[in-house]
Swiss-Prot record:
SMART domains: DEXDc (SM00487), HELICc (SM00490). This is UvrABC system protein B. The keyword Transferase does not apply. Belongs to the UvrB family. The keyword Membrane does not apply. Forms a heterotetramer with UvrA during the search for lesions. Interacts with UvrC in an incision complex. It comes from Pectobacterium carotovorum subsp. carotovorum (strain PC1). It comes from the Bacteria. The UvrABC repair system catalyzes the recognition and processing of DNA lesions. A damage recognition complex composed of 2 UvrA and 2 UvrB subunits scans DNA for abnormalities. Upon binding of the UvrA(2)B(2) complex to a putative damaged site, the DNA wraps around one UvrB monomer. DNA wrap is dependent on ATP binding by UvrB and probably causes local melting of the DNA helix, facilitating insertion of UvrB beta-hairpin between the DNA strands. Then UvrB probes one DNA strand for the presence of a lesion. PANTHER family: UVRABC SYSTEM PROTEIN B. The gene is uvrB. GO terms for biological process: nucleotide-excision repair; SOS response. The beta-hairpin motif is involved in DNA binding. It is found in: Cytoplasm.
Length: 670
């Protein structure tokens, strides 16, 4: 029997969690396609989902709206399931500029991208786990709806080696080259192999710490063993091993040759259309670019921008959806959409933006019309492909509610007994002076305040005003990158300052138990930032503090305010009733401040590791930008390989441990 999920936690489900777990499981077992979990801030939604996954033993994909929340989810799931395959699948681009054409200025912008190798390795590891195991949780961003290599071709290209099989060395090396592995007898790194006599060492593309040694005797595989690529220490011998391609986009030679013929046919048809419309420049440009791509594909098996021919390479018809990560998920897989009120609209919006850019490229002769089929999934295609789905949000959107038939599974009662914040509505006329008074009360007892305004100008003016009156205040705006944002949140929690002012301020995501007051200025101005869901999410930022309170400044109560206040009061009444019935005294959360910084730390799965760790140096890297972290990772990798080549294995192993901590920090930062 395949391995089951083993949930590792010191806690048992409490509050509304047992009932939510029971109802979700029953719904899934009864075949419900859509369920919605309405879980308030701090109610343990992730723990509830972890229990459902563990009980049902089904491979699961969890979608998050951005890399920060994906890294946070990945870290939490790693802790809950240390013995199972918890994988991370987000965009592997540190920087990405798609090709585009601006007709007004006759400017063509070439594609420019920087790929992060470590995240590429984690993506390959995720698809391998989905193909090989049942106990898999893949935490992904919306990157999951973008085109990926066809799983059928990917499986056909795999190289299976078993002990005792008859195969000569040349055949193995030829197959490795087809999988896009490169031979490197000097620097042994991911996606390479080396040959020493009748021994072939292969460093799998999806692995970060284990390599394969193939020992041949004449034309027979005598032994297969896994070893540490750094120290050369053999970890175990295995009866069989499967080597996966170095990239998801690998294609057999015969398919490439067939694709080239199809591209030539389309090019001839498109040239006729352009010439018939007197588009001579466009016709010449298209012919030149496409012929160059065809020559590259013939010689090398790929070309720059080969993804624009993906329709032919995967054998799809015009308009058919591209293969994506969803095609790798087993038929009985489970989909969990976190912060669904944000993630679902994101999925729907990806296709149109991509389409508009590509139509311009096709119209002006930079690409063939088939390039339009290199795209993310349409929303309808996502709906058709999605397995049984659980939507998770404190404020579910209309789509989720409609799909769930209006039924939501409430998770309102927190295991800690904490109540939703008290809400007060106060007049706008005196909002700034009233806020100053409230801030001083909170600062005196070492509590923090979040203030949300409607405009950037007002946020700047308010910050300046509070500073003039001696308050320790910072302003969070859109120009601040993810890493700096995490630093600001940490400084707020540490008490470096007392007030954080923003516009669309921290609605979903990182939580701060020290915040006891949320002030919403101009709450009576209906709009995107003052909608019912925005107000509930913002009010929820004070829900982890015993003295949590929200002040809405407005001269009238708008429909959105009325709904947000009504929903918060409903939750608070239910929480109070539960606490009274069970004799629970609310307890404030004491979340460690380091928790929000060390997101997605991979567990050390290696065997025979030394006790020397590199946590102390890693602490220095917390404030570095993703680019600086990447440069540091490359520098340490180079030093590590030098130590290994000089047989200084202790120093190399110490650097390897430091690299693991650095890579985890990089995931959190990017």
């Amino acid at each position: 029997m395949s391995k089951v999920f083993t949930l590792n936690s010191d806690f048992k489900p409490a509050g509304d969690q047992p009932e939510a777990i029971r109802r979700l499981k029953e719904g899934l077992e009864d075949g419900l396609a859509h369920q919605t979990l309405l879980g308030v801030t701090g109610s343990g939604k992730t723990f509830t989902i972890a229990n459902v996954i563990a009980d049902l033993n089904r491979p699961t994909m969890m979608l998050a709206p951005n890399k920060t929340l994906a890294a946070q989810l990945y870290g939490e799931m790693k802790e809950f399931f240390p013995d199972n395959a918890v994988e991370y699948f987000v965009s592997y681009y540190d920087y990405y500029q798609p090709e585009a054409y601006v007709p007004s200025s006759d400017t063509f912008i070439e594609k420019d991208a920087s790929v992060n190798e470590h995240i590429e390795q984690m993506r390959l590891s995720a698809t391998k786990a989905l193909l090989e195991r049942r106990d898999v949780i893949v935490v992904a961003s919306v990157s999951a709806i973008y085109g990926l290599g066809d799983p059928d071709l990917y499986l056909k290209m795999m190289l299976h080696l078993t002990q005792g099989m008859l195969i000569d060395q040349r055949a193995i090396l030829r197959r490795l080259a087809e999988l896009q592995y490169s031979r490197n007898d000097q620097a042994f790194q991911r996606g390479t192999f080396r040959v020493r006599g009748e021994v072939i060492d292969i460093f799998p593309a999806e692995s970060d710490e284990i390599a394969l040694r193939v020992e041949l005797f004449d034309e027979e595989v005598e032994r297969l063993s896994l070893f540490d690529p750094l120290t050369g220490h053999v970890l175990q011998t295995v009866p069989r091993y499967t080597i996966y391609p170095k990239t998801h986009y690998v294609t057999p030679r015969e398919r490439i040759l067939q694709a080239m013929e199809d591209i030539k046919v389309e090019l001839a048809d498109r040239r006729k259309v352009l010439l018939a419309n007197d588009k001579l420049v466009e016709e010449q440009r298209l012919s030149q670019r496409t012929q160059f791509d065809l020559e590259m594909m013939n010689e090398l098996g790929y070309c720059s921008g080969i993804e624009n021919y993906s329709r032919y390479l995967s054998g799809r018809g015009p308009g058919e959806p591209p293969p994506t990560l969803f095609d790798y998920l087993p038929a009985d897989g489970l989909l969990v959409i976190d912060e669904s009120h944000v993630t679902v609209p994101q999925i729907g919006g990806m296709y149109r933006g991509d389409r508009a850019r590509k139509e311009t490229l096709v119209e002006y002769g930079f690409r063939l019309p088939s390039a339009l089929d290199n795209r993310p999934m349409k929303f309808e295609e996502f709906e058709a492909l999605a397995p049984q789905t659980i939507y998770v949000s404190a404020t579910p959107g209309n789509y989720e509610l409609e799909k769930s038939g209006g039924e939501v599974i409430d998770q309102v009662v927190r295991p800690t007994g904490l109540l939703d914040p008290l809400i007060e509505v106060r007049p706008v006329a005196t909002q700034v002076d009233d806020l100053l008074s409230e801030i001083r009360q909170r600062a005196a007892v070492n509590e923090r305040v979040l203030v949300t305004t409607l405009t950037k100008r007002m946020a700047e003016d308010l910050t300046e005003y509070l500073e003039e009156h001696g308050e320790r205040v910072r302003y969070l705006h859109s120009d601040i990158d993810t890493v700096e944002r995490v630093e600001i949140i940490r400084d707020l929690r540490l008490g470096e300052f007392d007030v954080l002012v923003g516009i669309n301020l921290l609605r979903e995501g990182l939580d701060m138990p020290e915040v006891s007051l949320v002030a919403i200025l101009d709450a009576d101005k209906e709009g995107f930032l003052r909608s019912e869901r925005s107000l509930i999410q913002t009010i929820g930022r004070a829900a982890r503090n015993l003295r949590g309170k929200a002040i809405l400044y407005g001269d009238k109560i708008t429909p959105s305010m009325a709904k947000a206040i009504g929903e918060t009061e409903r939750r608070r009444e239910k929480q109070e009733a539960y606490n009274t019935e069970h004799g629970i005294v609310p307890q404030g959360l004491n979340k460690k401040i380091s928790d929000i910084l060390q997101l997605g730390q991979p567990t050390n799965r290696g065997k025979g590791r030394g006790n020397r760790k590199a946590a102390e140096p890693a602490a220095r890297y917390e404030l570095m930008t993703p680019k600086a972290l990447e440069l540091k990772i490359r520098e340490l990798e180079s030093k590590m390989l030098t130590h290994a080549q000089n047989l200084e294995f202790e120093e190399a192993a110490a650097l390897r441990d430091e690299l693991q901590a650095l890579r985890a920090q990089f995931i959190a930062a990017s």
